[in-house]
Amino acid sequence: MIISSEIVSAEEFCNFVKDIGGYIPHLGASRGGVDKGESSVWLGLLDEDMIHEMYSDRDVAEWEAKLGAAPQIIVELRLDHSPRAKLLYLWVAFIFGTKWNSILYDVNGELLSYAQVSGRYQEFGVEW
């Protein structure tokens, strides 16, 4: 999941998803997806209230320390099982981080700064 210290409205989120070639299932939704080749990533926006309902104070404090500010939103990411799905979700996190201060809690349970996300993505040298 992507964790950001910036407030991202549902409209901004939807525009982001569409700008990267993704889709929104219906007007006003705060979820969508991105398909590239045979890989898909589903994205869902959670606001600050949902963060505190769904996650422990300890988790939130850890994210705040890594972000340098309190988390305001989470973008949940769900991947398919295709060979390049992890690369696609890393690309989504990389592009998101160019717009908003963020970190990534990756599929291996590791908390990555944007610099680490950027480095890992650039290692692959893939352009979508």
Region annotations inferred by a language model:
Residues M1-W128:
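Acidic (Asp/Glu-rich) sequence patches and key acidic residues
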